[in-house]
UniProtKB/Swiss-Prot annotation:
Gene3D superfamilies: CbiD-like. This is Cobalt-precorrin-5B C(1)-methyltransferase. It catalyses: Co-precorrin-5B + S-adenosyl-L-methionine = Co-precorrin-6A + S-adenosyl-L-homocysteine. It comes from the Bacteria. Belongs to the CbiD family. Its EC number is 2.1.1.195. Pathway: Cofactor biosynthesis; adenosylcobalamin biosynthesis; cob(II)yrinate a,c-diamide from sirohydrochlorin (anaerobic route): step 6/10. GO terms for molecular function: cobalt-precorrin-5B C1-methyltransferase activity. The lineage of its organism: Bacteria, Bacillati, Cyanobacteriota, Cyanophyceae, Synechococcales.
Amino acid sequence: MKKGFSLPLWVTGAAKSAIKKLIGLPFEDYELIKIPKEKNLIKIKVHSAGLINEESQALGISFVDSGLDLDLTQNLEIWTIASLEKTYKTSNRPLDRINIIPGYGVGIDQKTSKICISDFAQKLLVENLLNIIPEGYTLNLEIVFPNGKFLAERTSNKSFGIVEGLSIIGTSAETFASASPDQLQNAKAQLKQIIANKVCDTIIFVIGENGLNLATSSNIKFPIIKVGNWIGPLLVDAAIQKIKTVILFGYHGKLIKLAGGIFHTHNHLADARIEILVYLAVKEEVPLEIIQKLSQSNTVEDALLVLESFSLSMADKLWNKLSDTIEKRSTEYINRYTKTDMKVGAIIFDRNRKIRWSGNNSKDYISAFKGF
């Protein structure tokens, strides 16, 4: 598989090139990017950099090469506009010297209007830009995705309160297709490392990038592994490795497939989310007229809104039942391949990134998640 790098690296490459141009250094068609807590440098190609606005600003441009042909951000054009502002305040906080501004096509939180950017992306910018900002100055860095607003319409960002464009939520340097064998091997390697280090006998399997961002920004003390679409094989591997408890953590639209026994969750292989929800609604004796509306819903999110508009308590009851069913079907799946006492829990968050539902096996753990 072709190797590629996540969105934050291409943003950082363009930004570094822009700042260097602004302070008078010659343009190079690549930048070496340092990854926090790692020794290696990654070479990121930069398309161009030049001075603009009467040389008061510099524009750096890069194009994402994620290595994944089906990735939404593949070939995404990135503009970073850098300017320096004299400051008379001293601060020990690195982010006080870098003002990250969401420009056109970059996602912001609908409630706060703050840029949607992961901790990894922020640390990456600080690691690579702080040392080249002249002493006594603050960097204003505007990030623009010219095609970001259009591309965001093809994501579930709005379900999470992210508007105006694409969020910058990459959490690692390299990219892996969620359905690729590389993703599976990477997750297995992480699991093996956790076991070798005897870190913990409870592990969090995170489904989806938003779930990973939510989990890693918390104070959860358990190890976290992003599992992509390879949930089934990784659950079996964890059981074989004698892990005591695995908590599945994710958005309801991602996890619902497990309740239907679908353990490779890529959409091109299987979907059936609405059908699974309708089946559970029938078992829970939801009124027929509501079941009919559920069956006509385009998305799981729409179905949840239908239920909540009818009865909040019924919606919560059904989604807790969904969590419980996920736990039971996961255990059944594992036992097809190996006999185990490993418990599988399921904790689900909603469109507002609010953690709301859990199954019987995860009731003792949900308070740890709700603590942030």
